[in-house]
């Protein structure tokens, strides 16, 4: 009899716990405000799990995505290339007016090549995507060279002559660069002391008499120096010998090495601080877990970036991961996909129709959009492509079927704040309970379930089956049996 009673009690307890456990995952209907009459149901998703298979596939034509064909070849030869995106305002004048003065480019140098000395009428920051090399900076008072490698961030100050050597014998040197012109918004020029196949020397802007007097040499010698490279058909990226590489790299130092103590003017110290490289991977990732890592150099922490208000970032995502939805308060990110493909989603107040060739403000009189609609921007972004994330726009990235690597330049990064909308640490879970009820029309328990169920911060698995449930949330049936006397 006693055993029968224990069994009955045990079964009742098990049934009660199971019912409570199931109810805890239900949406409590009475805590929702009743829908307004005429309210329509949202778009349905295709059936399927969260692992990437079955996700709703959609491709929209919008100005935030720049495919490989968007690049123009500024220079190309068998030794390497320089490819530049058009001005962002040429693509969408109204949308990208805030970043009109910024240009994005890619540089690739084949093994054992040399990018000839030149300077820009612009400031530039590049990230080394692949390979190793040496960069040397030269002024009329000082010169300094550095070894550079994958993950290095290098500032090239406006007007400072520099040249780059790919010291590797097998691997190309690849750079992603953001450039900030100082003369004409969105337009900059390279200035070369020596002529090449497609570039004139800036000495061509002076008369022979002036040059001969300035250098104190005969005009015949001057002519050979200025025009020789052009006559033999060499480009701005040239093949060099192992001995030349050894000579060019002989005095290069690692960015981590301290400068030798010597007397120098304060302005020279400032310049040397600006052009000293640093490595993103030497910085602890600001976001990191099993599903992704995010390294970021902020202008408040690096003198090289401070006056440009630019951040440099490197993101690594594993297959089947999600960079949780978030937005940047002031920063617009220009993002380059270094490897893999991913699904990019973003909320925007601007509407774009499939096949639309004109964006708001392009070729038409600008009119303020007072629409309250939010539109979904969706793209599959792949290796070699660029996408833009404007300030204030909530977005997310899903690496569904492969690992994903991207680098980014954050424009107007000073005093910008990144706010996550989902994850263990998120904006919505911090709302006052009363504000939550008024805003979303749900009770506190439902809000807590909605905004605190994610067990990961920053990066999360796309499959719900991979979501780890903390031990404290798991039902302990053994404790029930213990209570019943088994």
UniProtKB/Swiss-Prot annotation:
Signal sequence segment: 1-22
Record domain Cupin type-1: where: 64-223, 278-448
UniProt cross-references to Gene3D superfamilies, sorted A to Z: Jelly Rolls
Tissues expressing this chain: Predominantly expressed in the embryo and endosperm of developing seeds. Also present in seedlings.
GO process annotations (BP): response to virus
Cysteines engaged in disulfide bonds, as pairs: none
Disruption phenotype: (Microbial infection) Reduced tobacco mosaic virus (TMV) accumulation associated with altered endoplasmic reticulum (ER) transition in TMV-infected cells.
Region called Disordered, residue ranges: 34-60
UniProt keyword terms in alphabetical order: Glycoprotein, Signal
UniProt cross-references to InterPro entries, sorted A to Z: Cupin_1 (IPR006045), RmlC-like_jellyroll (IPR014710), RmlC_Cupin_sf (IPR011051), Seed_Storage-Functional (IPR050253)
Residues the record marks as carrying a glycan: 168, 316, 455
Induction line: (Microbial infection) Accumulates after 0.5 to 6 hours of tobacco mosaic virus (TMV) infection.
Family: Belongs to the 7S seed storage protein family.
Primary role: Seed storage protein. (Microbial infection) Involved in tobacco mosaic virus (TMV) replication. Required for endoplasmic reticulum (ER) aggregations mediated by TMV main replicase (P126) upon viral infection.
This protein's name: Vicilin-like seed storage protein At3g22640
Organism: Arabidopsis thaliana
């Amino acid at each position: 009899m006693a055993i029968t009673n224990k069994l009955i009690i045990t079964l009742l307890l098990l049934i009660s716990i199971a019912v409570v456990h199931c109810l805890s995952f239900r949406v409590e209907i009475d805590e929702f405000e009743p829908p307004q009459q005429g309210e329509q149901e949202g778009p349905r998703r295709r059936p399927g799990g969260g692992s990437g298979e079955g996700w709703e596939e959609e491709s929209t034509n919008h100005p935030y995505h720049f495919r490989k064909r968007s690049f123009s070849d500024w220079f190309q030869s068998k030794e390497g290339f320089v490819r530049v995106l058009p001005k962002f305002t040429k693509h969408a004048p109204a949308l990208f007016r805030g970043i009109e003065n910024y240009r994005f480019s890619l540089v690739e140098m084949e093994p054992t090549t040399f990018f000839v000395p030149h300077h820009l009428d612009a400031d530039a920051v590049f990230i080394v995507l692949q390979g190793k090399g040496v960069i040397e900076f030269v002024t009329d008072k000082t010169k300094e060279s550095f070894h550079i490698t994958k993950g290095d961030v290098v500032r090239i100050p406006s007007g400072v002559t520099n040249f780059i050597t790919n010291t590797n014998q097998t691997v190309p040197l690849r750079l992603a660069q953001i450039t900030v012109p100082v003369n004409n918004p969105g337009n900059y020029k390279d200035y070369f002391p020596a002529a090449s196949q497609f570039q004139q020397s800036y000495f061509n802007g002076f008369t022979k008499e002036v040059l001969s007097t300035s250098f104190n040499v005969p005009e015949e010698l001057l002519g050979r120096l200025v025009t020789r490279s052009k006559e033999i058909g060499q480009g701005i990226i040239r093949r060099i010998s192992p001995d030349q590489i050894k000579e060019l790299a002989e005095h290069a130092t690692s960015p981590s090495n301290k400068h030798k103590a010597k007397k120098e003017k304060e302005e020279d110290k400032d310049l040397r601080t600006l052009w000293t490289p640093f490595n993103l991977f030497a910085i602890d990732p600001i976001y990191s877990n099993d599903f992704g890592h995010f390294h970021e150099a902020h202008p408040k922490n690096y003198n090289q970036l401070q006056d440009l208000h630019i951040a440099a970032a490197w993101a690594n995502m594993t297959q089947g991961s999600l960079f949780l939805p978030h937005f940047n308060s002031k920063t617009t990110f220009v993002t380059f996909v270094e490897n893999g493909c991913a699904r990019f989603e973003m909320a925007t107040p601007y509407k774009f129709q499939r096949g639309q060739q004109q964006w708001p403000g392009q070729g038409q009189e600008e009119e303020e959009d007072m629409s309250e609609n939010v539109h979904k921007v969706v793209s599959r972004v792949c290796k070699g492509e660029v996408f833009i994330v404007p300030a204030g726009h909530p977005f997310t990235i899903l690496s569904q079927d492969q690992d994903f690597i991207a680098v980014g330049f954050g424009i107007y990064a000073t005093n910008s704040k990144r706010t996550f909308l989902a994850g263990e640490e998120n904006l919505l879970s911090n709302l006052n309970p009363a504000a939550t009820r008024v805003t979303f029309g749900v009770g506190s328990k439902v809000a807590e379930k909605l905004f605190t169920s994610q067990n990961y911060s920053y990066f999360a698995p796309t499959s719900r089956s991979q979501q780890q449930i903390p031990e404290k949330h798991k039902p302990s049936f053994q404790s029930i049996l213990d209570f019943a006397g088994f």
